Swiss-Prot record:
GO terms for molecular function: ATP binding; four-way junction DNA binding; four-way junction helicase activity. GO terms for biological process: DNA recombination; DNA repair. InterPro entries: DNA_helicase_Holl-junc_RuvA_I, Hlx-hairpin-Hlx_DNA-bd_motif, NA-bd_OB-fold, RuvA, RuvA_2-like, RuvA_C, RuvA_C_sf. This is Holliday junction branch migration complex subunit RuvA. Residues 137-141 are annotated as: Flexible linker. Homotetramer. Forms an RuvA(8)-RuvB(12)-Holliday junction (HJ) complex. HJ DNA is sandwiched between 2 RuvA tetramers; dsDNA enters through RuvA and exits via RuvB. An RuvB hexamer assembles on each DNA strand where it exits the tetramer. Each RuvB hexamer is contacted by two RuvA subunits (via domain III) on 2 adjacent RuvB subunits; this complex drives branch migration. In the full resolvosome a probable DNA-RuvA(4)-RuvB(12)-RuvC(2) complex forms which resolves the HJ. Pfam families: HHH_5 (PF14520), RuvA_C (PF07499), RuvA_N (PF01330). One of its GO terms (cellular component) is Holliday junction helicase complex. HAMAP family: DNA_HJ_migration_RuvA. Residues 1-64 are annotated as: Domain I. Belongs to the RuvA family. Residues 65-137 are annotated as: Domain II. Its main location: cytoplasm.
């Protein structure tokens, strides 16, 4: 319903901000990653939003990027994860870190987020697999362009994100593309 707010930043009190849009102040809850990147009070601000209507409240959640909003929307689709928990997850880690944790099945990273226990972390890993954008999690762990090319080659050959990431970790960081692909294929063939 309300997809974006643009106006003047009137107040900042984590995790809530107030955005004045032509005399109407909207209370918006934002993840800490967005909060830390907000301008000073009185400056222009633009937030992508997700509007939640409940029986007892109407709440706006705001995000600096479309990736954050998309991740939030994927998180709240999961049973047992509401908007507050989704906001907590995005406050505890970036979208790229979340995608990497899901791709590499690292539940321990999710458990460190307040409000996420072992069962919820396992559910997140299972239900978010492949839903946070193509290769965003694996790409977050790539150190340089040649490793990115090696990763893309392995994915194009049909290897899963997890297999490709594991093979990439075993390679020296300064390896060339053709040599890296050869070594990765050898490691995956074992």
């Amino acid at each position: 319903m309300i997809g974006k707010l643009s106006g003047t930043l009137d107040d900042k009190n984590p995790p809530q901000v107030i955005v004045d849009c032509h005399g109407v102040g909207y209370e918006v809850l934002v993840p800490m990653s967005t909060f830390y990147n907000l301008p000073e009070l009185g400056a222009r601000v633009s937030l992508l939003t997700h509007f939640v209507v409940r029986e007892d409240a109407q709440i706006l959640y705001g995000f600096a990027t479309s990736q954050e909003r998309a991740a939030f929307r994927e998180l709240i689709k999961i049973s047992g994860v509401g908007p507050r928990t989704a906001l907590s997850v995005l406050s505890g880690m970036s979208v790229a870190e979340l995608a990497q944790a899901v791709t590499l099945q690292e539940g321990g990273r999710l458990i460190k987020v307040p409000g996420i226990g072992k069962k919820t972390a396992e559910r997140l890993l299972l239900e978010l697999k492949g839903k946070l954008g193509p290769d965003i999690g694996v790409a977050a762990s790539v150190a340089n362009d040649s490793q990115a090319d090696i990763l893309q080659a392995l994915l194009a050959l049909g290897y899963s994100d997890k297999e490709a990431a594991a093979a990439l970790k075993a390679l020296p960081s300064d390896v060339g593309v053709s040599e890296g692909i050869r070594l990765a294929l050898r490691a995956l063939g074992k």
